């Protein structure tokens, strides 16, 4: 008896085969970046803007693969992609350290290029939205001078109590600068980027770029048909069963 995974793989293969038989050009259209943007908008997914994002730098190994891969494919045209990677890894491990130096130099130069591009694309002094409480804490930093022996935790607790007292003693505080839900200030863009990297692990971030196809499912087939603009006039009796 087949496992659930095997049955789902077989079902997905059948669905994709049926779709491709009805729309011969669907793969070409599906991989088109403009189509991915339109489709993402149709199903409510906002594509990530990668217009001004500098291209990441390559490692020494990637430069090596870029140079050696064509010769491996030329020697073995029927080789599978995963086997190509095996051959590349083997050749890289056997490559003398002296011969690796040129790829190390290429990697260093490419990293300089990336860092320079990244620096040029930074938007310094971009406004950030913070709460009224944080603005209040920023204004009350002098508490550290009054109580130099307090720990950071104690200072935070004291500021919280002061904030609660401020709201009680100032019923109209909503009309003050602390009353706004968010206060616009300027911040150091580079520091903010570092903070985001430390707070949100890259593996937990939701990414959506046009080059990565969205998963095909039965509920999205209609949207695909409308965006492609093709008809099933020649195959009216053919249906996709999921």
From Swiss-Prot:
Gene name of this polypeptide: EF1
SUPFAM superfamilies, per database record: HMG-box
PROSITE patterns, A to Z: HMG_BOX_2
Protein name: High mobility group protein homolog
Gene Ontology cellular-component terms listed: host cell nucleus
Keyword Protein biosynthesis recorded: no
Key words, A-Z: DNA-binding, Host nucleus, Repeat
GO molecular function: DNA binding
Protein's cellular compartments: Host nucleus
Residues of the DNA-binding region: 54-122, 126-197
């Amino acid at each position: 008896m087949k496992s659930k995974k095997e049955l789902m793989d077989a079902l997905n293969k059948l669905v994709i085969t049926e779709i491709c038989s009805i729309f011969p050009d669907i793969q070409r259209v599906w991989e088109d970046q403009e189509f991915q943007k339109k489709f993402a908008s149709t199903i409510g997914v906002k594509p990530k803007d990668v217009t001004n994002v500098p291209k990441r730098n390559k490692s020494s190994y990637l430069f090596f693969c870029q140079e050696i891969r064509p010769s491996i494919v030329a020697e073995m045209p029927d080789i599978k992609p995963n086997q190509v990677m095996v051959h590349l890894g083997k050749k890289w491990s056997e490559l003398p350290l002296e011969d690796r130096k040129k790829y190390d130099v290429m990697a260093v130069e490419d990293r300089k290029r990336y860092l320079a591009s990244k620096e040029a694309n930074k938007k310094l002094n971009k406004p950030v939205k913070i709460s009224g409480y944080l603005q209040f804490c920023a204004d009350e930093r002098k508490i550290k001078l009054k109580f130099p022996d307090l720990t950071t935790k104690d200072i935070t607790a004291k500021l919280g109590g002061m904030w609660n007292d401020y709201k009680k003693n100032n019923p109209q505080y909503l009309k003050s600068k602390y009353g706004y839900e968010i206060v616009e200030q300027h911040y150091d863009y580079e520091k903010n980027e570092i903070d985001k990297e430390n707070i949100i692990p890259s593996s937990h971030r939701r990414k959506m770029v046009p080059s990565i196809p969205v998963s095909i499912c039965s509920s999205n087939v209609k949207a695909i048909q409308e965006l492609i603009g093709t008809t099933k006039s020649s195959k009216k009796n053919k249906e996709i069963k999921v």
